[in-house]
Amino acid sequence: MYKRQDEANALYAQGYNIYSLFITISTAGIPSAISKLVAHYNGLNEYGVSQKLNRSALYMALASGVICGTVMMYIASWPIVYNGDTNLIPVLRSLAWAIFIIPLMAISRGIFQGYSMMAPSAISQFVEQLFRIIYMLGATYLIMKIQKGSWVSAVSQSTFAAFIGAIGACVVLCLAWLKYRGVMQGTGTIEQPVTEVSTTELILKIVYQSIPFIIIESGINLFQLIDQYSFKRMMPLVGHFTKYQIDVLYALFAFNANKLYMIIIALANALA
């Protein structure tokens, strides 16, 4: 793909910017909110409320995943979304599959963290990235080197790797739940009388806790989308550029450099 690498990177970046917005809408802040609330009720020995909270959060994640995934699948073919580049349609539809299950995965991680179990969350993240990278590299090699196929198909399979990674992470989380479900259900502990908390109240608490995260993360995604949808319109106004040149410049601007500084951010977060 090296001859089309910048075009491929530009297409990949465009798909992921839209995908990131849908992920933010469906999950932003909710795992952290779940973690805090579960830890709060467990600290009060109200494990029954924690279990009710877990169920409410999982139902909420399932609903948001189905809604956001379906919407993204449907609007992928809208001209206002693909912005004149029909290659973006299969990329968005391949990413939509991941949105169906990523909210469930993210909520499950938050639940484990609420029980002070960091290992399942960390292992699931490692497995997610491992599966994603293996599938991405394998599919790209198969399409480009063996089948001599389209670079657009290779990009679509590279983005579909997010779904494969999410499945791997969900398997790890399910196995962890089977192993620790006795602890998570409060087996062997003295439980306080269950506080009467309605499902609606629990959902409102989750939403209230997650609002700051949604605002901040959505803001970042929206700025990236503004760049994405204005870049191709603005560049012809400042020079004579072909579509290929614009794609190359966009890849340098929105993808290649981003991946380098994200390494620094990841290291800074780890040290913090």
Sequence positions of predicted segments:
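Helix-loop junctions and terminal segments of transmembrane helices
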Residues: 28-43, 262-272
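Alpha-helical transmembrane segments of multi-pass membrane proteins
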Residues: 85-108
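Interhelical loop/hinge segments that connect adjacent transmembrane helices in multipass membrane
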Residues: 151-159, 174-217
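Interfacial/gating helices of multi-pass transporter permease domains
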Residues: 3-20, 151, 155-156, 201-209, ...
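Interfacial transmembrane-helix starts/ends
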Residues: 13, 48-62, 203, 207
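Membrane-interface junctions at transmembrane-helix termini in multi-pass inner-membrane proteins
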Residues: 103-125
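Hydrophobic alpha-helical transmembrane segments
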Residues: 124-138, 148-183
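Short membrane-interface helical motifs at transmembrane helix boundaries
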Residues: 67-86
